[in-house]
Amino acid sequence: VPPSAASGGDKKTFIPVEMPWQEMLGKVSFWTIWIIFVFGGMAGLTVIGNIARFGLDVLQSASVTETAAKAAAGTAMAWYAIFNGLGRIVWGKILDVVGSKMALFMLFFVQGLLMLTLYKMGVTAVMLAVYASAIGFNYGGTFALFPAATAQLFGAKNVGSNYPFVFTAYGIGGIVGPLLAGFIR
């Protein structure tokens, strides 16, 4: 999507888009990735903020002792952190192979499925750790994909002034997600 193709005889040459933030804010593509980032931030920060309580609730309702449930929730959070770092590396490579649009679609499709099924699937210590790892892996990917997508869509020249506007979505997701999760609980 990013660089616009211009016809040059039989060959296609790519003209990089270099857009200042004032112009970027008026683009549908900016608001699209901004909204996607809000939901990505909501998912990741909701899990960070609630995994311990969630683990305790779900595992204790499955007759796991409080001590074992606390240990499982702490272990799940550790796996979340490890896979978060790994996700940044792997999703960056995926973006290099398939491009930002497809990588973002893939990441958030998987993340959506994980978030929708977490409550039903994370009912054992092992499954809680597996889900926390997968969600952490995808959440880590957001931090590789969004800066690159910003550069691809709006130009590398202004990414330093453009990306902070994209990153405001993370703050909104960080406020709304945990509040929504607490309300739904």
Show where each model-derived region lies:
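Intracellular juxtamembrane helix-capping segments at the cytosolic ends
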Residues: 51, 141-154
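A late C-terminal transmembrane helix in Major Facilitator Superfamily
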Residues: 139, 153-185
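Hydrophobic core of transmembrane alpha-helices in multi-pass small-molecule transporters
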Residues: 38, 127-141
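Extracytoplasmic gate region of multi-pass secondary transporters
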Residues: 22-92, 177-181
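Cytoplasmic membrane-interface "Motif A"-like loop-to-helix N-cap segments
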Residues: 96-108
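C-terminal ends and interior cores of transmembrane alpha-helices
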Residues: 109-123
